[in-house]
Amino acid sequence: CSYCIVPYVRGREKSREPKEIIMEIERLVKDGVKEVMLLGQNVNSYGKNLSVPVTFAELLQEVEKIDGLERIRFMTPHPKDLSDDLIDVMSKSKKICNHVHLPVQSGSSRLLKLMNRNYTKEHYLELVDKIRSKMPDVSLTTDIIVGFPGETEEDFEETLDVVRKAKYDSAYTFIYSKRTGTPAAAMENQVPEDVVKNRFNRLLETVNEVSRSISNRYEGTVQQVLVEDVDDHDASYVTGRMTNNILVHFPGSKDLIGTLVNVRLTECRGFYYMGEQENA
């Protein structure tokens, strides 16, 4: 992307051999690990530079076969080449978490072209519809940049439109930061700081408004939670995540860390839930 310094710092993408990945996960599972995260700058590019090419969807299918592994997460897919095969594998999987982080960055097709993102607003929203048609209960999150060089009020309104239509559970929002050596750093029409701050605040308001409108949909249900830690604010509580990556806090001891627990979600508090252990 025209604003990103990562390729200049870390070099071109490299794919690890599938067997190496599988063996590492098997070792982790033997040590008691229940969930793994497969991480890549763009997971859709995985396997293209291997001597025997493998797609990321095929890798996920192999990882799913590992006995004892309960959950598989991954990030980040790029909207420009997220395949139907990957969506199909996710929708049929019993282990891949019900969460897709799909960075949009901007809702303006004009800005997306300047960002060198290689997709349009229309393509992105079609992809969101395709994902939701296969996984109706999916949790969708994103990344958004405000204040990219040349961003107009009309461009920004397009971004707000995508937020409302995609109905994100949450979004990581950023103010554009110039990175020396990137194409974007040399672009004209840098947006004034006061305009950027105003748009950033409006974006946060819209993201929170959309999130609040859908966040309580699990209230009263029983969900499986992987316990991660003792609650930071109350040692008599533990915290963990549902498969859709939403946090849950409920009464429990540190002995529950690393285990999967059925929790009744009693109250939604915005981006997280309070709950009670079911049949404790």
Region locations from a protein language model:
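Glycine-rich phosphate-binding active-site loops on the catalytic face of alpha/beta enzymes
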Residues: Y172-Y176
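Terminal RNA-binding accessory module
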Residues: A186-A280
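Conserved, mostly hydrophobic/aromatic
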Residues: I21, L38, F74, L102, ...
